[in-house]
């Protein structure tokens, strides 16, 4: 790992960085296997893995030879059982090399992340990966803005565009040819059965490789936007960084910025907006501004033209929707978010004259929609489509404690993820559904009625189903007579949540 770090060390020079020699390092494939199991990026050292750093060109030579050999056999053998078996092995070899290629490409961007965090003196950078870290940003910014746009990030229509994008970073021809081989090989294998599917629909076999390709595509699409945003603002941007799903990208392409500065200097006045904010999530993005509706339409036109000119991709205008914040709510990561106005009247008296002053305070609200959650619970067989709790027959063979723990853990996950809701009535309804579904499952197991079963267990069943949030709040606010009342009002954001709730994600 130290050898790789020295090779990709960030300095001011424009040295040539050759990728392909590392494909002949045996520990690269050990790293790919290790990080595929752990789903992390490269902060650890290779010594922790217990692998040696010995070179083995024989491994890669065998893989390449077998791939070419299988290609010839597939051409000569048509529609036979052996052909299907050979195709499976070919995919396995391609997967091995592509995962190693992705490992090598992720390292320089991981180093850029570490360098940027150290330069900005950001401590506890792992908190930036939390999904909940976006909501405090919304609370602080959106209440002062007027318009919001929802953008569906498009995908490039041609694979060569992806190769040209990565050409700015990969400067050796063999690696570019290898990248082109991976993309076209995957595209050809999938085009027969799924011609309409995007190349970015990551398969389980090549998840890391295509996650890296997708992240780099998004990084490139945001690069010009960030440049224009910085140029159009009179105030210096205090912080900027893109935190992606799998790999963290920081930095700019210097020569590309020079070209853009020459091309767009005359049109920058169209985009002068010091109150523009941008958030990306799950292949979508949100653009919020304090400007007028006309200014948002200019940003919309710019994005459409940018996708067409830079990626040669025709994007439908309906991909970008513009709405006013104070009368529009948007679904965001399991929450129904929006800005609500609280009108108030203040009476002011000066000598013998009195005045009535009408004011309104904007407040960012995060609500949990009940209908989608009931739909996801119905899919998981905890209730019917109308929200009536039903038993879980597949869990009836478990012990009583395991059944109670499973239902309790599901609700605690719900409560933990949706702890930032402005109103908790939805969570109380979810608690009722899961608690009664648990009771029905236990009653079904013991061939009893729900009423008789609850009467036999008493309050012990309810105590084991109590949420941890109410217990913690009762310790933090001991003087509050009712912890549930306090939990009904408080919004809590946890910085340890890096995955969306699985049932919420079904919506």
Curated annotation (Swiss-Prot):
Keyword rRNA-binding tagged: no
GO cellular component: chloroplast
Compartments (UniProt record): Plastid, Chloroplast
Pfam families (UniProt xref): Intron_maturas2, MatK_N
Record keywords, A-Z: Chloroplast, mRNA processing, Plastid, RNA-binding, tRNA processing
UniProt main location, coarse: plastid
A GO molecular-function annotation: RNA binding
Annotated TM spans: none
Entry's Gene Ontology BP terms: mRNA processing; RNA splicing; tRNA processing
Function per UniProt: Usually encoded in the trnK tRNA gene intron. Probably assists in splicing its own and other chloroplast group II introns.
Family assignment from sequence similarity: Belongs to the intron maturase 2 family. MatK subfamily.
HAMAP family linked: MatK
Protein name: Maturase K
Originating species: Cananga odorata
